[in-house]
Each structure stands twice: as structure tokens, then as C-alpha cells.
């Protein structure tokens, strides 16, 4: 295993963070011919958000910027098993966005128009179609539902295993439990990193450390928008098949799907201040249970198997921070990911191309690291997350 190998004295590119973002980037860099790629992670295998997410793959949102980016990522998910040579277990079961309020129905009307503009295959379901797609849903509560047939789910454990195997087969050196303790600069640009007393030279560094993104940016001496935030999820005991597609209950800030084993997995967001903890709590559990019970009454008898929390890095507009850092040549960032599992294939591909060629793809450009300094946030009204007050 690469983790048993000694650290090199230098690397062509160092990636800090070996979650799905870091591994996707490493794989794509290797596909572009980059050698001597080093990936360092302070935690254990699948110990971060890449091992603690809801596994949903959503291929479109309500803004053109998010839709174009995540539609590309969804398309890449569909061919990812063949490309990696490992089964990522992507299931194209669809994704249904459900609205209860009239204002949410209007949002879904506008969302459909965005999808048509972007060439996305989606449709507003009639009451009859919705009963076919989600027969167990409390239809009397629904004002509108928009369905994305090409979206679905992909278990994080399968995707992470596939990316890691593909990276190591291409010679990428991956080291877990290897925290970076300092970031060096030389002549006004990135010069390398330090792991304890050892210095590893490199003129290209990528910060893909999830919830530790702000701490890593501080280490590099550069500003970075955003903050770490705890998200929680719940799994119910297995039950008979009730929910076919993945589901977003927009008005309840709740997302969910049913696994092949029959467990309903998902979570609801509640307004809370940013917390750097993995402790699960009762308010989120109660909000999730209420959403399940009211919108899928047949789940009322099901017991909660487990509730867990994961840490992500959230930007001001909830969008990714992706690309070169404007304050330090040689430094790149992949942060701000509240939908990092779904966006990993596109992020890895587009960021790798930007690093190697210097050309920024139009689907990636809106998520530039310095967009807030330029007063150009990306407004996305269709996310299932809560702002804190």
C-alpha cells in the first residue's frame, strides 16, 4: 500500500485532502499525464465527509451556473465505473424535487425553464405521474414536483474505493494519517509543504481538505471564504420498497433515498450556528423524523437505526470554491463543497485541466475563489441547506 511508503523529497503536485475531491483530482491529473502526484490526508481512510454523506447524485439545480456544472458531473458519474475500472455502483433511479408551498411551485416552474435553457432532461410531474413515481408520498401536501430522470445515487464507499484503486494503479502516492504541519513559499509562490520535520518540495499545491479548508488557507497565509459546518443524516431500519427515486423535500430542507437493503437514508437541515463537531443532536433528528412521517406516512412504524454527523466547508453562497487562489501563485483550492460527492467527477476533471493547461472551463468559472471579493456570488435557490442567523 502507498501509505507504507516513505514520503518523497519532492512532488510535481501535492494535494492536501484524500477525500473524493482530492482523489478525483489526482486521477484526472494522472489521466492528463502528470506524474509524481502526492496526496496527503491528516485523517483516516473515508474519515471525513466523503464517508459521511447521503450519496445522492443530483444533476441539476435552479440556477444556470449550478445546473451546467452538476449536469456535467452527473453525466460523468454514468460512465465512471468504466473509466475507473471499478464499480462505483451508480444507480440512475431519478431525483424528484418536491414543493409544498405555492412559492416553491413557482420556483420549480422557473427551474424547469432553466433546465430547458441548459438542455437538461427534466419535467414537472402531473398528479398522476407523481403517483406513479412516488406512490407512498402524501400527495395532498404537494403543490408541485420536478423530476430529473438521469440523476440518482452512488454509495460513497464504492466511489471512494474505485477512485483510490484507480489512483494507485496509476502511481499516485496516497498517505492517510499524514497531517501537513506547514506550507512553504519560495519567491512569492508555493514552494512545498512540511510533514513534521520533513520538507516536500513542490511548486503546485491543492487544498482539498474539506472542513479544514480555512485552517489550511491560514497555514498558507491566504484568505479563504467560508466556515466548517456540521450536517447530519439518519438511517431507518429496512422496510419494503417505498421510495424509488432520490427525493428533495424543498420546503423541509430534507433529502432522502431508499437503499437496496431497504433503509431510508437522509436528513433535514435546521438553522444552527457553524459547529466543528461530529456530535449528532435531537433537533435534527426530530426535524428529519417529522419530515419522513408527514410526507411518507408509511414510515411511521420504522425505527431509527442510527444518526450521524459529518463536517463540510460552506461558502457564503453555498457554492464550491474551485480554481487558482488569486493571492498566491501555485496554490489551487477545492473547497466550499456542500454537494461535494455529487460534484466530484466534474470538479476533478475541470480543475485538473485548469492546473495543467491554465485554461478555465466556462462551467467552472462562476465558482472562482475570489468571486466574493469581486461581488459576484452565485445565487442558487434550489439547495437543501439552511442559512444560520
Regions found by a protein language model. Name each.
Residues 54-133, 283, 291-293:
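Dinucleotide-binding Rossmann-like beta1-alpha1 core, especially the glycine-rich loop
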Residues 68-71, 97-106, 146-165, 279-286:
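Short beta-strand to alpha-helix junction loop
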Residues 7-21, 38:
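Beta1/beta-strand and adjacent pyrophosphate-binding region of the FAD-binding site
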Residues 14-16, 200-212, 348:
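Short hydrophobic core segments
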Residues 27-31, 57, 86-91, 184, ...:
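Active-site substrate-recognition segment that forms the wall
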Residues 146-203:
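Helical element adjacent to the flavin cofactor pocket in flavoenzyme catalytic cores
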Residues 30-50:
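Glycine-rich FAD pyrophosphate-binding loop
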Residues 296-389:
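C-terminal catalytic lobe of FAD-dependent flavoproteins
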Amino acid at each position: 500500500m502507498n501509505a507504507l511508503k516513505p514520503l518523497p523529497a519532492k512532488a510535481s503536485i501535492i494535494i492536501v485532502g484524500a477525500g473524493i475531491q482530492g482523489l478525483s483530482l489526482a486521477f484526472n491529473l494522472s489521466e492528463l499525464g502528470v506524474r509524481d502526484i502526492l496526496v496527503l490526508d491528516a485523517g483516516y481512510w473515508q474519515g471525513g465527509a466523503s464517508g459521511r454523506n447521503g450519496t445522492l447524485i443530483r444533476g441539476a439545480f435552479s440556477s444556470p451556473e449550478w445546473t451546467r456544472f452538476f449536469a456535467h458531473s452527473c453525466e460523468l458519474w454514468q460512465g465512471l465505473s468504466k473509466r475507473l475500472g471499478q464499480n462505483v455502483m451508480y444507480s440512475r433511479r431519478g431525483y424528484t424535487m418536491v414543493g409544498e408551498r405555492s412559492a416553491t411551485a413557482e420556483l420549480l416552474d422557473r427551474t424547469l425553464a432553466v433546465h430547458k435553457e441548459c438542455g437538461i432532461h427534466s419535467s414537472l410531474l402531473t398528479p398522476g405521474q407523481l403517483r406513479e413515481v412516488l406512490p407512498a408520498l402524501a400527495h395532498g401536501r404537494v403543490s408541485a414536483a420536478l423530476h430529473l430522470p438521469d440523476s440518482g445515487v452512488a454509495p460513497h464507499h464504492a466511489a471512494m474505493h474505485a477512485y483510490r484503486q484507480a489512483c494507485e494503479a496509476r502511481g499516485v502516492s496516497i498517505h492517510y494519517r499524514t497531517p501537513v504541519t506547514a506550507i512553504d513559499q519560495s519567491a512569492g509562490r508555493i514552494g512545498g509543504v512540511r510533514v513534521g520535520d520533513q520538507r516536500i518540495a513542490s511548486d503546485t499545491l491543492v487544498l482539498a481538505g474539506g472542513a479544514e479548508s480555512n485552517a489550511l488557507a491560514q497555514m498558507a497565509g491566504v484568505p479563504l471564504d467560508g466556515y466548517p459546518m456540521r450536517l447530519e443524516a439518519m438511517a431507518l431500519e429496512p422496510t419494503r420498497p417505498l421510495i424509488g427515486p432520490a427525493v428533495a423535500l424543498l420546503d423541509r430542507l430534507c433529502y432522502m433515498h431508499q437503499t437496496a437493503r431497504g433503509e431510508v437514508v437522509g436528513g433535514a437541515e435546521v438553522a444552527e450556528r457553524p459547529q466543528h463537531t461530529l456530535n449528532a443532536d435531537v433537533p435534527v433528528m426530530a426535524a428529519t423524523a417529522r419530515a419522513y412521517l408527514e410526507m411518507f406516512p408509511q414510515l411511521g412504524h420504522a425505527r431509527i437505526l442510527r444518526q450521524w454527523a459529518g463536517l463540510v466547508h460552506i461558502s457564503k453562497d453555498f457554492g464550491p470554491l474551485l480554481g487558482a487562489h488569486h493571492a498566491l501563485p501555485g496554490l489551487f483550492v477545492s473547497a466550499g463543497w456542500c454537494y461535494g460527492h455529487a460534484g466530484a467527477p466534474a470538479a476533478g476533471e475541470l480543475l485538473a485541466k485548469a492546473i495543467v493547461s491554465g485554461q478555465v472551463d466556462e462551467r467552472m468559472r462562476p465558482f472562482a475563489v475570489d468571486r466574493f471579493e469581486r461581488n459576484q456570488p452565485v445565487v442558487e435557490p434550489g439547495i437543501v441547506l439552511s442559512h444560520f442567523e
